[in-house]
């Protein structure tokens, strides 16, 4: 069973699979999704020939390439930094020989990895080359379509140019003077001008002058865009060819294989010397360096390949946008061509009408000649070609096509060329040609008329295309394509008809000879022994007898003679009547035979047609049978070969079965030993599983604690048996953070709290389950520790965003409050305080009314009359001032303890126990 290799273009990994493994393309794509982790919707499958994979390719192709659309399209970022693989260097131990063997095993594994990496690099380059090939094919197809549209537009422009120079007034005058030969036949129109729609023709010409240049400008702009696209494509191809052809990775891989071979020779001996140890270390370091170099080369190859594929995707995206524009321009040109053809039909109406007259004349001449000088089938072919040539020009052309039954019987027994009893004479056609104003059209019509001779042989031919040269008249005189009417089947039929005609002539002559022999003697004819005497003979005889010397007749003799003459006359009349009746009977018989002959002729034609059909069916059936016999013979030979092969295979299978029996016995022993090993491994795995379960459960609980510390809580719903998580959500719980910190918080009616209880029974699921319930217990454990990490990350991130938003909001409010405080402070500092003085207030000081004291005391102006006095400073002169505004720099509170006159304790003679303040101020 042959296999097909499927390679991933982004990683270079290749996997082989059986060809008959896949029943459909969806099946193949589902398998690729499992193998390469590329979703079905993002897969692009290409063959080595850069064709999209179809079901038929699975049986013919040896390798398929898988492209990831998300990587090719650039939706997945490929900006990754290279991280070198961490490789362990083995140091020498106490046993150099054992260490050398370990190094050899380790290096062998590294060399195998280098081979695999080299193969993956080659696969990536092949896949990139396939993508480049597909891009070039796409670009070439687009250039080819553009070339076709350009050629089509060039021909259309050449066809439109003469149309724009047509003089419509001259055309109207020329056609107005032409009177139709039979108005009743030509739709009851009197003149050729009645078939024209000059208003429509004028609108088409105006549209060509106004809109067609803009269409050509669009085509020119599109041509420039496609030229730039082709240039960019070629630039990408040239830059990629050198990279694809590089062989640096192969050189590194071959070098690693050579070093491994040298290392194997060093470790082949029983004892490893100190010099060999150094050589082994050197080989080990070289292989490690080569492995790192190849790993870096693969990383660079993947990065470069992704950039190339993304460039290809961008170029194809540009071409995809340009292709509809090219298609739209092509459709516009097609519409212009249809309008051009419609206009040229009216411009060439003189030539079309002349062709109709010439064809009428040719058919009239052919019908009048009886078709003796030409083949009927050739005439049919000529008429069919003429109909195909002119059927889409003007409705009056249909007068030569309607009621035409182009078959052998109708065209040979009637005159189908003279439709509606319309017979055209050569002078009518000649007169019309002389009225045509265009010399080119006149010459073409004269050339066609010259082909209509007196015999009117049906040998005319017509051009393949009507308007290829710009007009009907110019097209008709272009390259001619002869109509072939002679085939082998027709020759055989004509030979059979000639033989049948000869046999019918012989049969007809034989019947006529028999009828003549029967009709030569009528029943009333006298016998040969009696003479039939006419009246003229009797008179001559009488005259002769009167001159003779015979004696005179008696009366009795005269009566007898007259009686005999009367009887002879009556007998002659009866004979003439009988001959006339016989002639009428003969004529009716001839008419009957003519009708019978015509009926026989029709039957003969039917029989000949049936004979030809049966002969064709028999020939076809015979060919099918011969082919079937040949296929059956080949099938028999194949079956005989298969039987021989099956016999040989059966013998080989018996021998192989005996060998397999022995191998199975040995494998059974090995499996018993392996079973014991597996049991030991299972015991070890159970311990590992228990440790891993504990770690997973611990991680799950820590994640839950983290959520609770943020005020979030995970909520899950299980199915009936608790093995599947039906729904999972993370929502915020008010007060949960306070509870987590051990603080108490107030609760509203809508507040809710969640008490999470630890279910440690799920932690020991591996030790409490049986092999039958292992799967269900495992699924239950997974359900218990399930966390939707996408939702987890989303909720935590959103929570942090909310906290950051709240912090920014509070910071903004704090800045606002700080600004307001500063503003209030500034405002306060600029106002004079009246009470509740404090350091920094602006105070108005006034002199007291006790001028006897020296120096005169000053008091602070305030509300409520508390005692605030200004403390004098040395050098300050206030005696000549009426007021002082100063800012308090210091305050000293005092209580009166001394009596009046005590300058230290009561300098202002205040009452005992009264509280007063010394104020130190700086003048503002």
UniProtKB/Swiss-Prot annotation:
GO terms for molecular function: molecular adaptor activity; protein kinase binding. Its main location: membrane. Residues 514-533, 538-583 are annotated as: Disordered. GO terms for biological process: autophagosome assembly; autophagy of mitochondrion; pexophagy; piecemeal microautophagy of the nucleus; protein transport; reticulophagy; ribophagy. GO terms for cellular component: Atg1/ULK1 kinase complex; phagophore assembly site membrane; vacuolar membrane. Residues 552-582 have a biased composition (Basic and acidic residues). It comes from the Eukaryota. Keywords: Autophagy, Coiled coil, Membrane, Protein transport, Transport, Vacuole. It is a peripheral membrane protein. Residues 552-682 form a coiled coil. The keyword Transport applies. PANTHER family: RB1-INDUCIBLE COILED-COIL, RB1-INDUCIBLE COILED-COIL PROTEIN 1. Belongs to the ATG11 family. Homodimer. Involved in cytoplasm to vacuole transport (Cvt), pexophagy, mitophagy and nucleophagy. Recruits mitochondria for their selective degradation via autophagy (mitophagy) during starvation. Works as scaffold proteins that recruit ATG proteins to the pre-autophagosome (PAS), the site of vesicle/autophagosome formation. Required for the Cvt vesicles completion. This is Autophagy-related protein 11. It comes from Yarrowia lipolytica (strain CLIB 122 / E 150).
């Amino acid at each position: 069973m042959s296999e097909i290799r499927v390679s991933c273009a982004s990683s270079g990994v290749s996997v082989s699979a059986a060809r008959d493994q896949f029943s459909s393309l969806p099946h193949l794509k589902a398998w690729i999704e499992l193998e390469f982790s590329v979703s079905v919707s993002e897969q692009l499958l290409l063959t080595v020939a850069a064709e999209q994979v179809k079901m038929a390719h699975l049986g013919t192709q040896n390798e398929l390439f898988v492209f990831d659309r998300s990587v090719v399209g650039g939706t997945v970022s490929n900006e990754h930094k290279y991280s070198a693989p961490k490789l362990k260097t083995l140091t020498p131990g106490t046993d150099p020989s054992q260490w050398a063997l370990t190094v050899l095993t380790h290096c062998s594994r590294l060399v195998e990895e280098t081979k695999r990496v080299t193969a993956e690099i080659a696969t990536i380059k092949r896949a990139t080359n396939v993508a480049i090939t597909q891009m070039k094919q796409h670009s070439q197809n687009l250039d080819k379509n553009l070339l076709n549209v350009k050629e089509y537009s060039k021909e259309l422009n050449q066809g439109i140019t003469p149309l724009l120079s047509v003089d419509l007034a001259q055309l109207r005058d020329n056609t107005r003077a032409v009177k139709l030969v039979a108005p009743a036949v030509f739709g009851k129109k009197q003149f050729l001008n009645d078939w024209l729609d000059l208003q429509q023709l004028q609108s088409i010409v105006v549209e060509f002058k106004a809109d067609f240049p803009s269409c050509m400008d669009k085509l020119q702009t599109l041509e420039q865009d496609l030229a730039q696209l082709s240039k960019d494509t070629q630039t990408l191809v040239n830059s990629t060819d050198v990279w694809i052809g590089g062989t640096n990775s192969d050189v590194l891989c071959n070098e690693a294989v050579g070093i491994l071979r040298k290392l194997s020779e060093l470790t082949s001996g029983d004892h490893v010397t100190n010099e060999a140890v150094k050589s082994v270390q050197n080989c080990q370091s070289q292989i490690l360096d080569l492995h790192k170099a190849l790993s870096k080369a693969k990383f660079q190859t993947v990065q470069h390949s992704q950039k190339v594929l993304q460039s290809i995707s961008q170029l194809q995206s540009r071409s995809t946008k340009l292709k509809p524009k090219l298609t739209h321009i092509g459709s516009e040109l097609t519409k212009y061509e249809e309008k051009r053809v419609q206009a040229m039909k009216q411009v060439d109406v003189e030539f079309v009408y002349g062709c109709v007259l010439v064809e009428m004349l040719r058919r009239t001449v052919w019908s009048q000649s009886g078709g003796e000088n030409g083949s009927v089938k050739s005439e049919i072919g000529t008429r069919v070609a003429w109909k195909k040539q002119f059927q889409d020009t003007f409705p009056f052309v249909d007068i030569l096509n309607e009621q035409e039954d182009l078959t052998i019987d109708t065209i040979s027994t009637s005159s189908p060329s003279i439709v509606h009893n319309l017979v055209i004479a050569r002078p009518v056609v000649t007169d019309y040609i002389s009225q045509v104003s265009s010399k080119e059209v006149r010459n073409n019509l004269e050339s066609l008329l010259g082909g209509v001779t007196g015999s009117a042989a049906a040998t005319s031919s017509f051009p393949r295309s009507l308007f290829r040269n710009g007009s009907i008249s110019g097209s008709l005189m272009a390259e001619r394509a002869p109509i072939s009417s002679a085939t082998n089947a027709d020759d055989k039929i004509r030979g059979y008809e000639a033989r049948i005609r000869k046999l019918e002539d012989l049969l007809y002559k034989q019947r006529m000879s028999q009828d003549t022999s029967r009709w030569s003697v009528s029943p009333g004819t006298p016998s040969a022994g009696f003479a039939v005497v006419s009246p003229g003979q009797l008179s001559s005889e009488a005259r002769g007898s009167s001159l003779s010397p015979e004696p005179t007749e008696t009366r009795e003799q005269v009566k007898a003679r007259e009686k005999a003459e009367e009887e002879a006359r009556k007998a002659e009349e009866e004979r003439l009547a009988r001959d006339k009746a016989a002639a009428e009977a003969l004529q009716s018989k001839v008419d009957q035979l003519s009708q019978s002959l015509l009926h026989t002729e029709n039957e003969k034609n039917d029989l000949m047609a049936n004979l030809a059909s049966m002969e064709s069916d028999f020939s076809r059936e015979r060919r099918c049978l011969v082919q079937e016999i040949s296929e059956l013979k080949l099938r028999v030979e194949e079956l005989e070969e298969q039987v021989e092969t099956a016999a040989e295979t059966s013998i080989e299978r018996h021998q192989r079965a005996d060998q397999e029996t022995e191998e199975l016995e040995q494998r059974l022993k090995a499996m018993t030993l392996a079973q014991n090993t597996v049991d030991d491994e299972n015991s070890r795995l159970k311990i590992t599983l228990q440790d891993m379960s504990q770690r997973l459960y611990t991680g799950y609980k820590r994640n839950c604690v983290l959520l609770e510390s943020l005020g979030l809580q995970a909520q899950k719903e299980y199915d009936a048996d608790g093995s599947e998580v039906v729904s999972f959500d993370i929502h915020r719980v008010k007060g949960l953070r306070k509870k987590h910190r051990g603080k108490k918080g107030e609760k509203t009616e809508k507040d809710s709290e969640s008490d999470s209880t630890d279910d440690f029974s799920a932690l020991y699921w591996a030790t409490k389950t049986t092999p039958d319930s292992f799967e269900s217990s495992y699924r239950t454990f997974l359900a218990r520790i399930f966390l939707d990490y996408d939702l987890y990350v989303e909720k935590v991130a959103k929570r942090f965003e909310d906290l950051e938003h709240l912090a920014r909001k509070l910071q903004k409010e704090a800045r606002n409050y700080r600004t307001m405080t500063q503003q209030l402070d500034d405002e306060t500092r600029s106002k004079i305080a009246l009470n509740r003085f404090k350091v920094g207030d602006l105070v108005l000081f006034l002199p007291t009314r006790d001028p006897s004291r020296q120096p005169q005391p000053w008091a602070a102006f305030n509300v409520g009359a508390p005692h605030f006095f200004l403390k004098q400073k040395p050098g300050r002169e206030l005696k000549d001032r009426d007021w002082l505004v100063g800012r308090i720099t210091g305050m000293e509170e005092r209580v009166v303890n001394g009596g009046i006159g005590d300058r230290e304790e009561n300098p202002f003679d205040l009452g005992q126990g009264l509280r007063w303040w010394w104020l130190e101020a700086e003048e503002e």
